[in-house]
Every structure is written in C-alpha cells, then in structure tokens.
Curated annotation (Swiss-Prot):
Record's protein name: Histidinol dehydrogenase
Cofactor: Zn(2+)
Keyword annotations from UniProtKB, A to Z: Amino-acid biosynthesis, Histidine biosynthesis, Metal-binding, NAD, Oxidoreductase, Zinc
Gene behind this protein: hisD
Pfam families reported in the protein's UniProt record: Histidinol_dh
EC top class, as a word: oxidoreductase
Record-linked InterPro entries: Ald_DH/histidinol_DH, Histidinol_DH_CS, Histidinol_DH_monofunct, Hstdl_DH
A molecular function GO annotation: zinc ion binding
PANTHER family, sorted: HISTIDINE BIOSYNTHESIS TRIFUNCTIONAL PROTEIN, HISTIDINOL DEHYDROGENASE HDH
Amino acid sequence: MKIKSISGNTSVSLKRSIDAGTEEQRKAVRGIIEEVKKNGNAAVSAFTRQFDGADVAGFRVSEEEIKEAYSALEERDLEIIQAAIFNIKEYHERQLATSWFYHRKDGTMLGQKITPLDSAGVYVPGGTAAYPSSVLMNVIPALVAGVDRIVLASPPGKDGKLSAGVLAAAAELGVTEIYKMGGAQAIAALAYGTETITPVDKITGPGNIYVALAKREVFGQVDIDMIAGPSEIAILADSTANYREIAADLLSQAEHDAMASSILVTDSETLAESVLKEVYRQLEHLPRKEIARQSIDNYGLIYVTETMNEAVSVINELAPEHLEILTVQPDALLGQIKHAGAIFLGRYSSEPVGDYFAGPNHVLPTNGTARFSSPLNVTDFQKRSSIISYSREAFRANAEKIAAFARLEGLEAHARAIESRNREED
C-alpha cells in the first residue's frame, strides 16, 4: 500500500480488470458443461470426486441431514441467522414491485404486469468454508419476489457433507431442494438439468473463476445475476475519522482475497500517513495475514486530494463495490455520490454490518460496474410484461398514423395488418 497525492483531473482506477480466465480455463469449463449436458448425474458425480474429493452417492440433501445440521449448530448461531433473516426480509419487502394499469380518455388501457420467475438456482461456495450469509442474500429476494421453486447448490467437503450453517439457513427459509455439488458442474446441472435435477430459470451466487466462467457460458440458456470480481472497499474520510477504524475496515476486505482492493480517499495527509502505518501494524495480527498482505501490497492505495470535492470525484470514478463515508457530516455528501454498490454512512456503519446483518443485499457490482449495475434485489427475480388494450375509438383515430409508420420502416405487412381492421370496420 502506498500514498498517492492527486489533484485536478487525475485519472484513477481499481488497478485490475475483470478476470476473464485463461483460454485453458475457458476450455475446461466448456468441456465440463458439455459433459454434464451429455451424461447428467454421472458427470456431476465424477467431477465431484475429481475436484472436491468427495464420493457423494446422492446429490440431494436428505431431511435427516437437515436435522443433523440443526443439532450441530449452536443455538446462539441459529438465533443470529434468524435475526439476520428478519432484517434482510424487512428491507427487501420494500423493493417488491406490483402490476399497474391506467386508462386514457379514449378507452385505451395500458399497463405493466409483474410476474415472478418460476424457478431460481442459488450457488453457495463451500468445501473448506461456509457462507450462510450467501444463502440469505440470494434466497430472500427470490422468496419475496414470489419464486415458487428455489434450488440451492453447494460443493461438499471431503466428508460428503455441507456445512451446518448453510443447511440451517436454507431450511429456515423453506428451501429443501438442496444439492451437494459445486463448481462449473453445478452451474451446468442447474442450467441444463440432469436425470434428477430440473433446470432453473436464473442462477445467482458467488464462486471461483470456474463458477464465474460457467455462469458466463450458460447465460442465455438461463439468466444470471452478474459476473462478480474480487471484493472492493473504498473509504472516503476527512481529518475527523479514526485511523484505527479505517485500517480495520480496509483489512476486512483485504482478508477476502489476494486480489481484493482496499482504497482510502482523503483530503488529510496526516490521516493518510496514520492509516498506512496502522494497516501494516494490524495486519501482523490477522489469522489470514498472508492473503491480506498480498491484497494490501498489490491492490491497496491511499489517495490524498486537495479538497473533499476532489475526493468525491475520485470515488465516483472508482465506482466501488462498498463505500464508507467517514466524515464530520456523512449525510451531507450522500447526494454527491453517483456510483457505488453500497454506501455506509458514519463510523457505526462498518462494512461487515452490511455483509451480514443490516438488511441490504451484499451481492454487489464490482470492478467499477457500479457505474451501470445495481445490487441483487427483488426485481431481479421478477419479469415485466407490457399490457395493451386498444379501444375501437383509439384504433380508428390512430390507424392511419400506425400504418404510415410501418411503411416508413419498409414493413408493408405491418401496415396491411392495421388496414385490414379498418376495412372490416367500414
């Protein structure tokens, strides 16, 4: 991590591009997908043995396994999951869109019909780690949207089991169609189906490069949420901010991934220098310090600007996944922020608050795509159909214009379709 003083129209970036994978990786993913399409369950089983070291007799999690998960989970952990569910549901229920219609004076009725997807597949990373928060953040928007069938897939550990936290989180949300499969083979099975797995309409959830490439490959057969890159945090701070807290928040993202990006933007050189020293001091005491060190060394940066307005401009150019505003009046700057996946205001809104508990979704656009993308939300699991009911009066008043417009585009059959009705009316 280093300090860089900038001013004026200096260009900034997150210092990396979305990983499109190597040609070898892309070829491997295409091969896995084709094998699953051809051989179904047998292919998924073979790849699970090869990549996860697990020999899973049946992919689907049984009721007994869910009961075992509840028994293995500490009561306090279950209570925390339940509290998070309440918060996340409460937030996402406010996003729910409904159908609407209106009438014109000529009797025309127009509208928009909102319909939930029939099915969704949620991918949850697994193996040596457990991410019940990914279950909550991907399943709850689909539930609120009204999706009837929600399927969960997660790679098993070498013992052939999924984590108790993941299973309990899914069960608390009423998801019981859970499969012990991961990687590109899971994405292929969800997209194309197997002898025992019915394909879904949309796939969401994070994963490694093979999962990301597989999602890219199956897009079009199914919808996907996004192709997310490594995690990012940007902190906008003035001289009133606490340098120890800033360092801790920067490291909270750095420990995710060696390619995670942690950036401070400030108009205070004194704060910048204090944060730089504190980051490396705290780093030494982290269990995942080697991963965090690679991230901080390669993708950590502190920008020092001359004014706070310049600092805000830097943030908008970065368009970060997570943005913390740690200034004397964070609310006053909110209106100036145009591009960020999630915005955390004030010292008590540390980024992990949003990761797990506050309510907003933690599936966020990365790598500057917050310029044109949004967090995962309820509308991602809903479709919109336009409704047109033209009255006789409206048709007769506009038929000539519509036919003329069709001929303007050289589409004679369109024009005649309109005129055929006019002739019937005469």
